[in-house]
Structures are given as C-alpha cells and as structure tokens.
A protein has these predicted regions:
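Non-catalytic DNA-recognition/assembly elements of restriction-modification systems
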Residues: 1-55, 60-73, 167, 171-211
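DNA target-recognition domains and sequence-specific DNA-contacting regions of bacterial/archaeal
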Residues: 33-34, 38-169
C-alpha cells in the first residue's frame, strides 16, 4: 500500500509537466499560443451530473454494508451498499472548508468505478473532445478564486463554474494531447483501484480477527 502513492504522484507530475509544456509554455507551437485556439467556458468542455447526487446522513449510512465509496467535497467520506455513478468522473469541490488550494486552483477528485456522491462536489465528465484526463488538467491549472463566494462557507456554485472562461485548443491538438496523457492517468487510476481493493481486504481481515 505504501509503495503505490509515490508512483501515482510521479505519474500525475509527469502529466502536469506535459500540460505546462503544451498550454503554458506552448513549446510544441514555437512558444506562441496558436491563433486557432479560443477562449470558451467550462460548460463547453464539461458535462454536469449534479442532479444525480444524493446526500446520505450518517444515520442512513450506519446500517449499510461497506461496499462502494461515498464521496464528499474532497475525499471518500464513507462506504455504502449501493452506487449512483458507474464510470469515469471528476468531482470538483463545491463547498466546504476549502474549495481551492493556495494558488486558487479547484480541488478535484478523478474517479473511476462505481460510487455514490453527496452534494458537496460537482460531478463532471469531459465533452467536445475533452476526456476526463484533459479536463482534469485544464481545470486543475485554472485559478478559480474569483468565483469563490461565501466567507464562512466557501462555495463554487454551478452557474459561476459553467460560465468560467477557459482556453479551448483546436481538436487536432487536443486529440494529440489526450493520446499522450491518457496512459499516465490510466495507470494512476488502476493503481488507486488496487489500493481500494487492498484496503477493503485489510478491513475484512481485521474484522474477522476481532470477531
């Protein structure tokens, strides 16, 4: 279990370095932003599934079998006996103690598999040529502090997120970029899935030892 997180950190760092080279330094394009690129909005590249979220109280979860992860704003909160989502999604923190990091970048979870989510995170999938991998990299490198509202309870509401401006490259560039970063994310997500399996097995073995 302890060996996998450093590997995943390196995989993500590599993907972030590729993003920086392409979309910050524009190295494949002679150091200049191509004129064919444009500024669009998040709702042009992300599909929202917030209407499918369903919060469960701790009392509701107490009697459930611990099978599927139950996600909150920034992490797994619990495990439950059913799931709402099945596939690859991004969860972007909607409200909580923190919704952006020190650089103003949104807090994201990149998930694959069956899971439940409460209403403290926006549920997204890529569209218009954006995969969940490229959507993750574009959003995680975007300063969204201007749309964070609320002093006591910071929040990024859906309307502000959908309309937030973001750079959209042409489809050929995006396809090439996707082909480079996908193997990195694929390995990272598979590693995380293996971690969850091992953690579940460990919990099962421990419960049998004390019963």
């Amino acid at each position: 279990l302890t060996a996998i997180p450093p590997v995943n950190d390196n995989l993500l760092a590599t993907a972030q370095a590729v993003y920086k080279a392409w979309f910050v330094e524009y190295k494949p394009f002679g150091g200049n932003c191509p004129i064919s690129w444009r500024v669009g909005s998040v709702d042009e590249i992300a599909e929202f599934f917030d209407s499918m979220r369903k919060p469960l109280s701790s009392l509701e979860r107490a009697d459930m079998a611990r099978i599927y992860p139950y996600y909150g704003a920034v992490s797994i909160v619990d495990y439950v006996d059913d799931y709402i989502f099945d596939g690859e999604y991004l969860l972007l923190s909607e409200d909580g103690i923190y919704v952006v990091d020190d650089s103003g970048h949104p807090l994201l979870q990149h998930i694959i598999g069956k899971f439940w989510a409460n209403n403290h995170a926006h549920i997204l999938k890529g569209k218009a040529g954006f995969t969940e991998d490229s959507l993750y990299l574009f959003l995680s490198n975007t300063n969204m502090s201007p749309i964070v509202t609320g002093a006591a309870q910071p929040k990024i509401n859906q309307a502000n997120l959908k309309s937030f401006p973001i750079t959209i490259p042409d489809s050929e560039v995006l396809d090439r970029f996707n082909s480079i970063v996908h193997p990195l994310f694929d390995r990272k997500l598979n590693n995380e899935k293996e971690i969850r399996k091992l953690e579940t097995l460990r919990e099962l073995l421990l419960s049998r030892l004390v019963s």
